[in-house]
Amino acid sequence: MLFSDTKVRIIAKKTRETIVFFILFIIFAAVNDISIIICTDSEELPEFQASDFFHSSELFRIYKDTPRHRPVMVVARCADGRVAAHLLAVIRRRSWLVPPFLLWHCRIVGEGDYTGFEEHRDELFNLMMTELVKWMPVHVEYIELSNFTSKMFGYKTLSGLGFFAVNWLNIHNSLHSKSPEERISSKLLGRINGAIAKGVETHEVRTEEEFADFVHLLKAHNYFKPKRFIPDATFFRKVVESGCGKLLITTYNDTTIGCCAYAVSKGNAYLWYAAYLRKSYLRLYPAEVTVWNAIKTAYEDGCQHFCFLDVGLPYRANKLRDFILGYGGKPVSAFRWFRCRYKWLNRILTHVWSF
């Protein structure tokens, strides 16, 4: 026998689940007469209520005004004109010092917004992602999706579209049941209090000079880190103006030694970008103080959770992940999905990450 009875039953079960999923998907699309439109200009956007900042028309317009960014809003619309769901993707152009000197990649944070149609999330996500993959320009090297609310959300859809899953880790700090002081490790809190006693302080960016220091440190710190993409200063200015984000800087003797930017969406804070002068100010712990004050600011603003969008690469030895967990956060197993432009490379990576 090629397969044992157990394997045959597992394969049969998965096949039945897949068939049922697509039958429900076809019925839903037929009954609601769902059409998918792809918007690349602000004037094309239909009116809709967005509960998720990462998939809002506001962030779309911010990306539109930011150099090297091309936002794409995928909208699922009913026959009567109602917007059933929308998903924001952004195509970013990066410059490299080695070939290829220019690289385009598409980034999606979260699974989209399904306000009023939450029970049909799977079917709507399938429709939107299928159209987005068809539409995607040929020069885009890869597509990346991350930070889903559920690990298994979209598994069938993304696997069927040629995406491969990489085991990842999401970390968030709960702010609703205990104060940050009750969760942080005593050793880390001692370091932070010691640095504050020496004159280190964190506050929101208030002046143009502080904003310039924020942008300079962020870009200088991440210049030789190809994994991290830092947008133009326009992006950060407009995020603050939208009221959906905050910029913090940590200073010592009027010198900026740390900074971070976090966004607020659906009652949660998301640490988006950060930079620190760790080596130059080793005993002042700029990273520890900056992140700690960001968590405290989010707590004081009434946020329910403080989430980290970047916890480092999925390796067993990960200093960034260990550092973040020191604040008492909760690690949650997750997938991060990728799809490469070149089919042969995509097949190789799919096999590599399937082990």
Give the location of each predicted region.
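A conserved beta-strand-loop-helix scaffold within acyl/acetyltransferase catalytic domains
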Residues: N32-A79, A89-S95, F148, M152-V166, ...
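Aromatic (often tryptophan-rich) hydrophobic motifs at membrane interfaces
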Residues: V75, Y114, T130, E241-K343
